[in-house]
Design a protein with these regions (language model features):
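Hydrophobic targeting segments
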Residues: 17-23, 38, 48-51
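A structural signal for short, well-ordered beta-strand segments and their strand-loop junctions
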Residues: 104-108, 167-172, 237-241
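Short catalytic/ligand-binding loop motif for oxyanion handling, primarily in non-cytosolic enzymes
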Residues: 31, 59-60, 113-117, 177-180, ...
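Active-site-proximal specificity loops/subdomain of glycosyltransferases
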Residues: 53-106, 113-131
Length: 324
């Protein structure tokens, strides 16, 4: 889809299309998305944003984010002793959503730096590709990040309504070069990247299925661990390729891994791997990165292996385009 068409689609969204957006944060009261993206949101949009922090850090977060809170952003304290890691924090968010009867939510990391859309373009060599907007575009339209999330919500509701077996999704991680097909796809099911960092959750379906975050991923691997739980229970994941995000380099910004303690990091990655090896995903896990000695570092869903195992196929929904 060309730029003018996707911009028209984005401009036809409103704050009503936003999902409830939960952003867990720990030890970072001046978290990146709160410093750089949320101030560009409208007050009405901010009222659908929930920052989730531990009770002992609540006052500091409230002080650092008082301007956004005055404009409508919500700050939720997690009672002391309720969570002990990232996995239990994600579960707290899901429990909160269920308790408050929120049908669909986003669970987004606090270090997201850009929210962009893709459009049809060409490389310097003339090859067709999907280009993405950048920070310079925010100067022309500062509501781009909000509109991206509005369209995310609009598409997500469509997916969950038409495909109730889908419980989890996300938008795509920004790449330097994007396949030309991406800007033409509205959404795809059981294909594409593992849902991470900008997760979209069908809480109605998750409650009905009784799915919870596995305890094995409390300290590390919560994203892929939860996706594995969804899939092994017979449910599906989706992705929105025409929308993308970028984040702050985790090597310098992680609250879990310590760049100065490689042994601790190895232990965390091994915990993730050992947990995944106890699940069905062991049969369709692609080991994306390894330490120099070959130990597992990061993994993703191998959709080809998944479909071969289950005898299924992916599904792609394209944008409707008028024929000439």
């Amino acid at each position: 889809m060309n730029r003018s068409k996707i911009e028209k689609v984005l401009n036809n969204t409103t704050e009503k299309d936003l999902l409830y957006i939960f952003i867990p944060s720990y030890n970072r009261p001046r978290f990146f998305i709160g410093r750089n993206l949320l101030p560009m949101f409208t007050d009405r949009a901010l009222s659908k944003v929930y920052i989730v922090v531990r009770e002992e850090q609540y006052k500091e977060y409230k002080k650092e984010n008082r301007d956004l809170i005055k404009r409508g952003m919500n700050l939720i304290p997690i009672p002391k002793g309720t969570v002990t890691g990232v996995g239990s924090t994600r579960q707290f968010i899901m429990d909160y959503a269920i308790e408050n009867r929120l049908p669909y939510i986003m669970d987004m990391d606090d270090d997201i730096r850009y929210l962009q859309f893709l459009y049809r373009g060409k490389t310097n060599s003339g090859k067709e590709c999907s280009k993405h907007t950048g920070a310079k575009d925010y100067k022309i339209d500062p509501l781009i990040p909000q509109k991206v999330l509005q369209l995310t919500g609009k598409i997500a509701r469509e997916v969950f309504r038409k495909h109730p077996e889908v419980l989890l999704g996300n938008i795509r991680k920004q790449r330097f070069s994007n396949p030309s097909e991406n800007s033409n796809i509205r959404y795809q099911i059981n294909k594409g990247p593992t849902p991470r960092q900008t997760k979209i959750l069908n809480m109605k379906g998750i409650k009905r299925a009784g799915i919870r975050m596995p305890d094995a991923f409390n300290l590390h691997g919560d994203d892929i661990g939860f996706a594995a739980e969804v899939l092994q229970n017979g449910y599906s994941c989706f992705n929105i390729p025409c929308l993308c995000y970028d984040y702050v380099d985790e090597k310098n910004n992680s609250v879990v891994r310590d760049p100065h303690n490689p042994d601790k990091n190895r232990h965390l990655h091994k915990l993730e791997y050992d947990g995944l090896m106890q699940m069905e995903i062991k049969d369709y896990l692609r080991e994306s990165f390894k330490f120099p000695d070959g130990q597992y570092m990061f993994g993703d869903i191998d959709w080809r292996a998944y479909h071969k195992l289950h005898g299924t196929r992916y599904y792609i929904k394209h944008w409707k385009t008028k024929r000439k």
